[in-house]
Amino acid sequence: MSSLLEKTRQLNKILQKSGAEPVVFDDICNLLSEVLSCNVYIISKKGKILGYDLSTGFECQTVRDKVVPEKRFPEHYNNKLLNVHGTKSNLENQGECVFESGEDCGVKNKLTTIVPINGNRERLGTLLLARFDVPFTDDDLIISEYSATIIGLEILRSKQDEIEEEARKKAVVQLAIGTLSYSELEAVEHIFNELDGPEGLLVASKIADKVGITRSVIVNALRKFESAGVIESRSLGMKGTHIKILNDRLLEELKKIK
C-alpha cells in the first residue's frame, strides 16, 4: 500500500479500535514501521520508551545495547527532544553519536524525524522515526503527525485510566478500614508495622501479647481485609501466617489514621 489515503486508512483502524479498548503502543509502532519503512519509538515526556519497532533491521549498537534494554532514552537526549516544538524531519547525525558525547556514530546515512506528541495543551512525549538513506517525504510527515495525534489521545486516556484506578484502590482500602472495630484497627496498625514491607511473616500470638488484645481480634481484622481484596494471607502452621499486600494504597491510608 503506497498511497497516503491507504496508509491513513490503516491507521484509522487503530483509532477505531481505541474507542472500545486500550491501544498497545507497540501495535502503533509496528504498523507505522510497516507503513513508513522505518524504525519507530514512542517516548514519554520523562524519556521512557512506551513502544518501539526496529523491524527495518538497522539500528546503532548503542540503541540495541543500552536504550532498548533499559526502555529509556538518556536524559540529555530526551531534553533535546522536548525542546523540539514542531516536526523536524531528516536530521542527520553528522557522524557523532547522539547518545554518547564525543563518540563517533558507527551508522552512516541515518535520517531522524522528530514529531512532538501534544494533548490537553501540554507536551506528552515524542514520536521518533529513523530511516537510512531514503529521506522522509511530505506524505510520510502527514502520516507521522496524524499518528502523533492518535498517540496523544491514547496517552491521555491511559493517564485517566491510572487516575481512576488509583481512586478505586483508595476507595476499596477506605471501605475495608471502615469495617474494622477500634481494637481491630489497633491490631492492623501493629500488624503492618511488624510486616515492614509489602509482604512478610506474621505470628498473631506474638502481636496479641505485645498489644494486649486477643488473637481472634487479629484473625478477624485479617479476614476483613482479605475479603475486601486488599491482602492475601496463607497459614504456615506453627511458623505463623504469610501476608501479602495486594493494594498498594493500604499502607498509605493506614499512615493517615495515625
Curated annotation (Swiss-Prot):
Keywords: Cytoplasm, DNA-binding, Repressor, Transcription, Transcription regulation. One of its GO terms (molecular function) is DNA-binding transcription factor activity. The keyword DNA-binding applies. It comes from the Bacteria. GO terms for cellular component: cytoplasm. One of its GO terms (biological process) is negative regulation of DNA-templated transcription. It is found in: Cytoplasm. Pfam families: CodY, HTH_CodY. This is Global transcriptional regulator CodY. It comes from Clostridium tetani (strain Massachusetts / E88).
